[in-house]
């Protein structure tokens, strides 16, 4: 018998009034309204480039009765205006989610980045992830968000994986628990009624592929999973996490243990696997909260079966909310047909909607709607990008920037001894969902010049090196800055030189002192094993760049700690 929700228990612990609101609201819903509560819609500023609808936001709410909202982009004022309007137009208050994985920058364009998961791990202190969670909740609440799709509780076990390379909080269960527990506590400490959603069950980071592009597979056996990802999920469930995002990631060995009839051909991502969501997560681990699918346009889901089938199957399998429409009318019809045909039973539908309404009641959204405090005011935005948060960003960078190696003692670099710097800058194509800062190269150059260095930026579009003696006569040191950023256009991201055997390639490591600095991914030594000094800095914001230069010049100590994945299983990387 599938587990059904207990609204008196963790994570809801509803009082009599809250419980009554849930039951009365549920009893008053028509079938179409119940189905609508299952959906998160992705809203846009301007034309909808995702589902292609021509409906106004108010028309979407009136026609499809959605339970949750996400949005893409926008300044804090734009986001606040959007979310206020959505809440004003919705009869039942909305769950409004943001991806604040690293701070308030996940809820609005002018929000404050604090620290990525990798950065939190490198800092080896609970203060950095706690502050990251605190800022995430403060700034997201100010714009009207009440649910954070974070922290990420994946474990980075495979160094080739780049989709969670910087987002995961470590390479062991203990490290992930330490950092993500602090981040969740920081979110709750804000006192802003922002719910926590951990992701991506049953766990990313074991393989190199990206579930955005292909079915993800976690190949761990049941005992291994229980002692790693299982411990992480059990910890957060015990701590009262309200929501868990199921990934489009299969866990085949555990699926076959729970349902011995399954063959390889039957293995599904967790989002479509009742033995994982109902059996492992809700029954064995005792999760009583809301399960939401990861985004339904991802290939890990779309490659499983027809959309007509997987839309209702996700809910039938134990997920309670479905993330994003493709075509609104079609998807809504698919879900409604799934209920009418019995794919989704009446009991499963009511249980899912009861969980959704229960979370809304826990967040007091109905009370705020009744007393007129659900919409946020302009003065609330004063916290976004405030001086305290910017100071915390700088302190997080200082605590985490990591000297991975300096085997020839080439650091520090000082203008008195290494005045003429050849600067090599490596980035990725622009135009993606995530991309490198357009200011990063200028920021690095200006910081170096401010300290008295003479900086020449290399033109890496050529493969002509020129005379090596002339190079040594003109250059005192080389700094290679890798700002490789990417998301869901490739299964993994590595350094891509500007041209075959570009002059950016570190051919010069034995000619002049050479240091490589990564502003994002932590494993570039795989493609640059020859460099003798290597630094992981984790981000390209101005504070981080300033502090990196402080540390390269010996004005500040390196304080971050690396994990052994930085060596990418290459013995020569340590030389």
PLM features: residue spans?
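Second-shell residues forming the walls of enzyme active-site clefts
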Residues: 79-94, 104-108, 171-348
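Short glycine-enriched loops at secondary-structure junctions
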Residues: 44-47, 96-106, 146-156, 198-204, ...
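Active-site-adjacent structural elements in enzyme catalytic domains
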Residues: 76-93, 126-142, 354
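Preference for extracellular/luminal or secreted protein segments
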Residues: 1-60, 273-274, 283, 304-575
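Hydrophobic faces of well-ordered beta-strands that scaffold small-molecule active sites
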Residues: 35-43, 67-71, 94-102, 147-151, ...
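Short acidic, glycine-rich surface-loop motifs adjacent to enzyme active sites
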Residues: 36, 57-76, 236-268, 473-490
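Short, acidic/polar
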Residues: 47-63, 128-139, 224-235, 305-311
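A substrate-binding/cap region within the structured catalytic cores of diverse enzymes
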Residues: 123-145, 152-173, 180, 184, ...
